[in-house]
Amino acid sequence: YHTWDRYTPNPDKRWSVSDQRWKLIGLFSKTKPDPTKWQLYDLQADPGETKNIAGQHPAEVRRLRKAFTDWFSEVTTGQTYRPVPIPVGHDMRPVELQPSWATWTGPHINYTFDGYDWDTIDGWKTRGEQAVWQLAVAQAGRYAVTLHYGCAPLQAGGTLRLSAKSQPLDHKVRATVTAEQFSQFPAGAINLPAGQTTLKATIHHAGPGEFMRLNGIHLQRLPNSR
């Protein structure tokens, strides 16, 4: 049995199950999971997994899928999957808030993993769509904010609002060479209270298309701030 997701285990997106002869795979990233696109391989006749024969063996597909979902239910029942609070503000060291540590809401916003240190929050394009990080702030104070993102030249111009129980910090989205080429943009400073808090990144004013591809947010406590 195998399932892989950088956020919450999902029985439909990236999974596989095998026995001594058969291997059934479901692999979906940005596309909607579709049982007609599951892949079945005969490991004895085709150890290289070159020929998908799911359509020829529907009974094996049903058997293996049931075995997988039974196992998935057993190992996930009673478990809570959510990001832990990120420690911020220790000895003035900068902290990077990665996309995979956030939760997100909105009709278009999406998390994409294209490689280590190459994951993004993307797809968002309407006012109110947001990503949220849980923080554990060691010291209250003002924190410098640096955004790491890409934005296609024709899509720039929207406004990202950062907030954490304080005066919001607005950043006008700037263009990069392409949406896949990230740059760092100082966004100003924000007040963070000590203890548990949330940092929200919200579309305040939408641009003409995809808002940005956010690759990370860097926070660094400013000297002598309280």
Model-derived regions, located:
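Extracytoplasmic
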Residues: 48, 52, 61-226
